Amino acid sequence: MSEINNENLEPTSSTVAESTESKNKHIRSALRKRRGKLSAQTYEEDQEAILSSPLLTSTPKTVSRSLVRLYPYLIVVDNFLSIITWSNDNVSANLLGIFLFTVCVLYFGFITRYFGHLMIVGIIWVYLLIDKHVQETMASCPSLDDIIHVMDRVSMKSSAVLSPITILSAQDVRRLLFTIAFLSPVYIFLTVFVLSPNYLMLIGGLYVLTYHSKLIRRMRRYLWKFRVVRLLVFFITGLDLGGPDNNRRLFASVNKKIRSFVWNEVGNTSNTKKTVLFKVALFENQRRWLGIGWTSTMLSYERASWTDEFLNTSPSPEVFTLPEEQSGMAWEWHDKDWMLDLTNDGIIQLPASAAKTKVKPGADEGFIYYDNTWNNPSATDTYKKYTRRRRWIRTATVTTTYDDEPTVEKATPNSHALKSEENNRVRKRKVSFSTANEVHIIPSSDSSKLIQISDVSMSPSL
């Protein structure tokens, strides 16, 4: 009887499976190399199964068909963006692209005059090579999951390419247009007497092609440390592009609190020196991308790759600098290097005998893992975790010397508005490097005299 009952119950499951199989067989081999016209009938007639994806059961037929048609173009765009972002394994392709661009810009007239007819054949030959590469890629990665991975890579690389533009607001664009228009006489002088338009186009193109290379990134980071370079960029573009000194306002507000603290503690004593110890904390944020792994590339609407405790954008430890000595305030680092907090501010429990900090940690040490929305923290990495962060700390000291009582204004909206209006009347054009609204200095655990500063309102100008 039990066997008879089982035979009566199982046909339902088998019928569902056959129905699902019949729905999916027209897209199972959608990524196979095809000949002839690509149409809906081609999908229906194709009966050969190569490698199906579990996503086929939940993806509508029209969506799958559109993704299949889009896949070859995604492969081409992905390879092109890999060259632009220098994220490919073959650096020779980048160098070849730079060489061809240089030759085309400098000798475009000569090439078109004597080899224009051969250029047409060369373009067709390049197209055939690209088509062959696309077909090989489709044959080696013939599933719907591979299409999704390529789409993720294209999205991430496109965000990286457009990141210098997407950060600009409408007001920034208007300011840039006004500044560039104001500098038109300088541009005309350069193109007429110094450099021809071809050379200017060559310089601009090479800058774009090498913008994401490691060497150029390091050169920009090194040059950006010089205030002259930052001011030059500001006067050319009219934009506040931030940089290593975008924590200047942060320290300006901290200086005010220190002046008030020292005055209240030591009283009216001339030439009084006071050393205050601070522990500065930076948080490194990363996101997991399918097919790539953990990277510092974040979504456009979420926190930056480096932030402070309040999620304000912060420079990375390599470019984080203390302010220069001014107004009786002398800042200097107490620790030699930045150290990773292996406990992540006490969240990760370590044995009592284990070290709590590390100067050169591993790539995966000290992280707290979260889900896709930065919730549900955990000390272990699982397949449900897509974001993570860890804490870097470094101790700094500030020595103060005062002869007179400092004037510390209360941080009220009215006082800030009045002060901003006065500064706008008299101040000259200068650069501001931060838009942070809060300062939080985490006190050290040493026995020295410490201060905790939080929720400090920023002054509108330095």
Curated annotation (Swiss-Prot):
Coiled coil: none annotated. The modification Phosphothreonine is found at residue 435. Residues 1-19 have a biased composition (Polar residues). It comes from the Eukaryota. Its main location: membrane. Residues 1-90, 197-462 are cytoplasmic. One of its GO terms (biological process) is peroxisome organization. GO terms for cellular component: cell periphery; endoplasmic reticulum; endoplasmic reticulum tubular network; peroxisomal membrane. Keywords: Membrane, Peroxisome, Phosphoprotein, Transmembrane, Transmembrane helix. Residues 1-26, 406-425 are annotated as: Disordered. The chain crosses the membrane at residues 91-111, 176-196. InterPro entries: Peroxin/Ferlin (IPR006614), Peroxisomal_PEX28-32 (IPR052646), TECPR1-like_DysF (IPR010482). Disulfide bonds: none annotated. The modification Phosphoserine is found at residue 432. It is a multi-pass membrane protein. Residues 112-175 are peroxisomal. Present with 238 molecules/cell in log phase SD medium. Belongs to the PEX28-32 family. PEX30/31 subfamily. PANTHER family: PEROXISOMAL MEMBRANE PROTEIN PEX30-RELATED (PTHR31679:SF2). This is Peroxisomal membrane protein PEX31. The lineage of its organism: Eukaryota, Fungi, Dikarya, Ascomycota, Saccharomycotina.
